[in-house]
Amino acid sequence: MKEFQTLKGDITKTRIFEGEIDLDVIDDDEIIVRVETFSFTANNISYGVAGDTLGYWQFFPAKENIDDQWGCIPMWGFAKVISSRHKEIQENERLFGYFPPSDYLKLKPTKITEQNFLDAVSHRKDLPIISNKYLRLDGAVSYTHLRAHET
């Protein structure tokens, strides 16, 4: 697994964390997604600059970060569920939402509808709901309609 990390005090300094992830280590009611694509824009740079002030570093704590010097700048993107222990979320579902610049992310879906769910992982509970909501693209009418017109 690879994860792009930024030095919180100087976002021009970066590193790639490489480690193993055991896709079978997953609790009941959790899912693991593989991040497929994301966008990195000027807006994301502002997330890094305001990371501590606005709480952006709390969304996805950096791995192997004992001294809390490194962070993961959040990005909007697409992912696919590759492992699920949640009875309402199926493997191979596609999602749109807030992701770290990483290969994988573990989520704990709650308040599930056909169109979306919230992530209930404890370190994100006090963060803005809009950034904790994941669209379930297979159930999103507008997305399905757009995909039907692809050639």
Question: Residue spans of the language-model regions?
Answer:
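A short N-terminal beta-strand-loop micro-motif at the entrance of redox/enzyme domains
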Residues: 9-44
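Conserved small/polar residues in nucleotide/adenosyl-binding loops
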Residues: 144-151
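Glycine-rich beta-strand-centered segment in the early N-terminal region that forms part
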Residues: 24-38, 52-106
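Beta1-alpha1 glycine-rich phosphate/pyrophosphate-binding loop at the start
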Residues: 42, 47-54
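Short, compositionally biased
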Residues: 105-131, 135
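Short, solvent-exposed secondary-structure boundary/capping segments
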Residues: 45-47, 92, 116-117
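Long, glycine/tryptophan/cysteine-rich extracytoplasmic
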Residues: 138-141
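OB/S1-fold single-stranded nucleic-acid-binding modules
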Residues: 2-9
